[in-house]
Curated annotation (Swiss-Prot):
Quaternary context: Monomer.
Location, primary (coarse class): cytoplasm
Short name of one Pfam family: tRNA-synt_1e
Family listed: Belongs to the class-I aminoacyl-tRNA synthetase family.
Motif 'KMSKS' region per UniProt: ranges: 266-270
Protein name in UniProt: Cysteine--tRNA ligase
Residues holding Zn(2+): 29, 209, 234, 238
Length: 468
């Protein structure tokens, strides 16, 4: 059936068809770099990086663009408070953002444009809208004529009359209509500005993404994505600007991830539950944070708590332990000619891969895909119970675990110190091997643990262990 994605525009799950066969043009709204990102900001980075990875896994050539908003009211305020330039603030937090994403194993975008580097294109875009009658200048500001775009509200599914009624609460004498939004802001004291046909000023927020998407991906793109908080007004305004400027459909698929709560409450500084992504990565490890995020469907809200993180850690531990156990058995697995057992394992492995693909094809359902990975672990563990295992089959399970977890951006093959739970699992396996009089396997586990610096002591009360 192929990949299907839930399109916010239609509110339906739709078959995924690209503008150009085999190629995907994808734009994801990036951060405003005035501070370190919080854990909620990390969610779209992780889920849409996973989408990108899966599209590549399925054979697509993906061009992934994520912008950096490096000029904004908040940036200007921080720069003025610190007595530095806006660029200095932006550079500092852009570097921090990229470092945070690296710790979460989020691949860098193919293109990471910045607003300050796109000013000429933004001015050209605004001028084009004015010339087409979709925008107007008012005392140095430039506004978009929302009423000229009859489809305004089609992404957020809000009737234009309702939007207009709500906008009347805010009175701005510069606007022709309360719902009109700013494309270019006239200069104010203490702000960074650029020269334009309308005088000194700087861009409005919404026009920036439209201009950067046009510059680096063209008039039409396949996927535009971001958090649900961006549906209105940001993405709604992007559509209005872009489609009025080009006369073409801006994006085929609009994807939005659900929000993240902390202990079932909205994250806010006033509640004292404002958690930075870097702090959590340092405390729990970026791989665990990523795994936790992917345990829920990307479109649904997700709740963060230390209890849930601990549960996620247990799940991730099951996967890494299975891979470790497989790698340990590889040394003693025997090379053999194909037989009925080998054919059965090949069939099981093939079916598991197909199930994983089916779940990911279904609107990138990482939650169900992880369930399939747990089934891989289960089948691998069942196979390892055999006294004699084949090298081909052990390696096939290892390769499958790496293949599927890499799609999710997890690195289970990285050499790591044995976790306590992994040591306990190996000791339990050794005990079972001794009960079954499989002394070769028992000695193999002891030697393996010794190589990892783990000393075993057999006592009347059971096996004790310690690190050298």
């Amino acid at each position: 059936m192929g990949i299907q994605l839930t399109n916010t525009m239609t509110r339906r799950k739709e078959p995924f068809h690209t503008l150009e066969p085999g190629k995907v043009k994808m734009y994801v709204c990036g951060p405003t770099v005035y501070n370190y990102i919080h854990i909620g900001n990390a969610r779209p980075a992780i889920v849409f990086d996973t989408l990108r990875r899966y599209l590549k896994y399925r054979g697509y050539e993906v061009t992934f663009v994520q912008n950096i908003t490096d000029v904004d009211d908040k940036l200007i305020r921080v720069a003025n408070q610190e007595g530095v330039t806006v660029k200095e603030v932006a550079d500092r937090y852009t570097d921090a953002y990229n470092a945070d994403l690296k710790s979460l194993n989020v691949s860098p975008p193919d293109i990471q444009p910045r607003v300050m580097q796109t000013i000429p294109e933004i001015i050209e875009f605004v001028q084009g809208l004015i010339e087409k009658g979709f925008a107007y200048e008012s005392e140095g500001d430039v506004y978009f004529r929302t009423g000229r775009f009859q489809e305004y509200g089609k992404l957020s599914h809000q009737p234009l009359d309702d939007l207009q009624a709500g906008a009347r609460v805010e009175i701005n004498e510069k606007k022709e209509h309360p719902l009109d939004f700013v494309l270019w802001k006239a200069a104010k004291t203490g702000e960074v500005t650029w020269d334009s046909p309308w005088g000194e000023g700087r861009p409005g927020w919404h026009i920036e993404c439209s201009a950067m998407a046009l510059k680096f991906l063209g008039e039409e793109i396949d996927i535009h994505a971001g958090g649900t908080d961006l549906v209105f007004p940001h993405h709604e305004n992007e559509i209005a600007q872009s489609e009025c400027f080009t006369g073409k459909v801006f994006a085929r698929y609009w994807l939005h991830n659900g929000m993240l709560n902390i202990d079932n409450e909205k994250m806010s500084k006033s509640l004292g539950n404002f958690l930075l992504a870097r702090d959590l990565s340092e405390k729990f490890g970026g791989q665990l944070i990523r795994f936790f995020m992917l345990q829920g469907h990307y479109r649904n809200p997700i709740n963060f708590s230390e209890e849930l993180i601990e549960q996620a850690a247990n799940g991730l531990d099951r996967i890494t332990t299975a891979y470790t156990n497989l790698s340990h058995r590889l040394d003693t697995a025997r090379a053999e000619e194909p037989n009925d057992q080998a054919q059965e394992q090949a069939r099981i492995i093939g079916e598991l891969r197909e199930r994983f693909i089916a779940e990911m094809d279904d609107d990138i359902n990482t939650a169900n895909a992880i369930t399939v990975i747990f089934d891989v672990v289960k089948e691998a563990n069942l196979y390892l119970r055999h006294q004699n295992v084949g090298e081909t089959e052990v390696r096939a399970y290892m390769d499958l675990l790496v293949e599927l977890t890499e799609v999710l951006g997890l690195d289970i093959a990285e050499e790591q110190e044995l976790l306590d739970s992994e040591i306990d699992a190996l000791i339990e396996e050794r005990t079972e091997a001794r009960k079954a009089r499989n002394f070769a396997r028992s000695d193999e586990i002891r030697d393996l643990l010794a190589a990892k610096g783990i000393v075993l002591e057999d006592t009347p009360q059971g096996v004790r262990w310690r690190r050298k």
